[in-house]
Amino acid sequence: MLELVYEEIEEKMGKTLEVFKNDLKKVRTGRASLALLDGIVVDYYGTPTPLNQLASLSVPESRLIVIQPWDATAIKDVEKAILQANIDLTPSNDGKVIRLSIPPLTEDRRKEIAKRVNQMAEEHKVAMRNIRRDANETLKQMKKDGDISEDESFAGKDKVQKVTDGYIERIDEVFKAKEKEILEL
C-alpha cells in the first residue's frame, strides 16, 4: 500500500524535474544551441512540420546556427516560422541556407534571464511541494481508513519529505548550473 504512494511521488517528481530540465534547454544563454529551435513548426505545403524534419541543423560556431532546408523552396516558410516562434533571433537567408546569429547577451539581459530561470525553478519546487501535499493527504486518508497504523503514517510522511527534499535539491543543482552558464561571459 505504502509502496504505491512512494512509487507515485517518485514518478511525478521525476517527471516534474524532466519538464524543468526541458524548459531550461529553451532558455537562451548567449551560446548557440539547437534546443532553441525545438518546437518550431513550419507550415510546409499546408502541413505543420517540425523544423528538424525539413532541414539539417548545425552549430558550426558557438554563436551561429545554420539551417539548411532539404527543399530549397521551403526556405521562406522556414524563415517565417522562425520569426513567428518569437525566439528573439533574426534569420538571414542566402537562398540556400538560413543563418541565425546569436548576439552576445548584455549584462542586464543576463540578469533578467537568470531571474526568469530562478522563477521557473521556484514554480517547479512548488509543483514538488504540491505532490508532497497530495501524498501526505493520501497517507492521512489511509490512516483514517485503518489501512495503515499511526507509526506507518509518520514513517510514510518522513519518507515523502526526504524524497521531496532530494528532488528540490536536484532542481537547485540544475538551476545553479544554468545560472552559472547564463552569467558567465
UniProtKB/Swiss-Prot annotation:
Keywords: Cytoplasm, Protein biosynthesis
SUPFAM superfamilies (alphabetical): Ribosome recycling factor, RRF
Broad class of where this protein is predominantly found: cytoplasm
Listed GO CC annotations: cytoplasm
Family: Belongs to the RRF family.
Function statement: Responsible for the release of ribosomes from messenger RNA at the termination of protein biosynthesis. May increase the efficiency of translation by recycling ribosomes from one round of translation to another.
PANTHER family found in the cross-reference section: MITOCHONDRIAL RIBOSOME RECYCLING FACTOR PSEUDO 1, RIBOSOME RECYCLING FACTOR
Name recorded for this polypeptide: Ribosome-recycling factor
Organism encoding this protein: Desulfosudis oleivorans (strain DSM 6200 / JCM 39069 / Hxd3)
